[in-house]
Amino acid sequence: YRYDLAPYTWKLVQNLQQGRALFTQPPMPIKCAGAPQKAMYLSCDHWLKSGRLAQINTQFYNAGGVLFGVADYVPALMKYVERYAIDLKFSHRLVAVDGPGKRATFIRTQADGSSETVEQSFEMLHVVPPQIAPDFIRSSPLADAAGWVDVDPATLKHRQFANVHGLGDVTNPSNAKTAAAARKQAPVVANNVLVALGRRDGAAVYDGYGSCPLTVEKGRIVLAEFTYGGKVAPSFPRWLLEGRQPTRLAWWLKARVLPALYWHGMLKGREWLAKPQKADTRHG
């Protein structure tokens, strides 16, 4: 990530008057699977409110086959896809960009497994690159065949080296790679390291929790929260915050509460709400 690219993207969005805007999403896993859509929805919201959306053809090229991996949140997102008249292109993987010529090249995977090359011109292109683990991890004995640290998805203990535990984006469990996941993983690893050192009894387990605040328009967020297997796992009662619908409360949480929680709670180990869950007999 480069800190200068967010304001650069915002400048492109503000300056685009008409034409074709392409937004891309690479194959999983990536950091926050909803991030490519967040930029797209906020851009479209700006164009809509500035009276330019009708002159801009927005296309979303997704290497995957679905809009979002947890089906419960798709209906709310589809309403915004329709509102912004976004053209969804599934199974399209970006492979090349001709910047000066303003052309993007994709590999489209067909239903029968065959593929074809697709080229598209653009006035604006928002690229989310494919993501891999750092070389020092990929080339180490800690990595699995795909290059990620190979840990048990529940205990986060390395499958081969009993004195190694892992957390965060570099590990191979199927959870969403988000700060919300790391927030839940860190206390589990801390507990289980103490167990391995003989200083605490009772292993803790991670349930795959992840969260993705999908910014569908300025002032409203669809707050996706889920565990392993795409099971919806809300932190708030539905009468207070219905995560499957866009709400202003979720925006307020993202804009006002989460930054303070991150800097003064998560990073300093002071957040009691992330207390680890102890393993039951199924985990030994």
Report each predicted region and the residues it spans.
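A conserved FAD-binding loop/helix module that cradles the flavin
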Residues: L167-V216, L223-E225
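A Rossmann-like FAD-binding core segment of flavoenzymes
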Residues: L48-A146
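A structural signal for isolated positions on well-ordered beta-strands in alpha/beta enzyme cores
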Residues: L22, N57-Q59, H165
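Beta1-alpha1 glycine-rich phosphate/pyrophosphate-binding loop at the start
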Residues: P27-A71, P276, T281-H283
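C-terminal auxiliary extensions adjacent to catalytic cores
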Residues: L223-G284
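Glycine-rich dinucleotide-binding loop and its adjacent helix/turn
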Residues: Y1-R52, P153-A154
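FAD-binding beta-loop-beta segment adjacent to the flavin cofactor pocket
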Residues: G147-H165, V216-F236
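FAD-site-proximal beta/loop scaffold in flavoenzymes
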Residues: Y1-Q17, S121-K184, V195
